[in-house]
Amino acid sequence: MVTFFSKFKYCCEFIRFDFQAFPQMFRYLITISLILFSCEQPILYHATAESIKKKIESEKDNQAILLNFWATWCEPCVAEFPMIVDMADEYENDLAVYFISVDWLDEEDKVLSFLKDQGVTWTTFIKDEKDQEFINGIHREWSGALPFTILYGKTSGEVVDFWEGEQPEKRFRKAIINAINS
């Protein structure tokens, strides 16, 4: 009988162990374990403006994309969060939703706890860059106010809408449908 650990040991024989990559490898092992044991948990990656742009570039041909920049201490962010999660489920075939937390890195556990409470089981990000550098790198018209939402068109891959501040469901829905059809 082949066990998980024997499979893991076999796979590791082909991987050169790198102590600098240990935190990332540990995250992958946790993710694999959660998948194997059917425990869906949010995955939180550290991100810079550049890495987020690369993620968008790699995904833009498949679906419309919604980026939501938020923080656990931001009341309007927390208020609109469940609505965005519901819309992510509703439009899952046509819309990729990425939450990017701008909380401090030492608040990572708090961010993960909030994501879990909200039922987020997909890849999310936490800002790992100085505030102004991050803000300027994301969008030239973003003042830094939260929440901040950007939508990229499904076909065009270009920014089709963006806004600062909490918005009603009607505004989100109209913008999402426009992004899916753009």
Give the predicted meaning of each segment.
Residues 11-12:
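Cysteine-centered motifs
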Residues 120, 127-175:
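Thiol/disulfide oxidoreductase modules built on the thioredoxin-like
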Residues 69-86:
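Conserved redox-active cysteine motifs that mediate thiol-disulfide chemistry
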Residues 81-118, 131-136:
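Structural microenvironment flanking redox-active thiols in thiol-disulfide oxidoreductases
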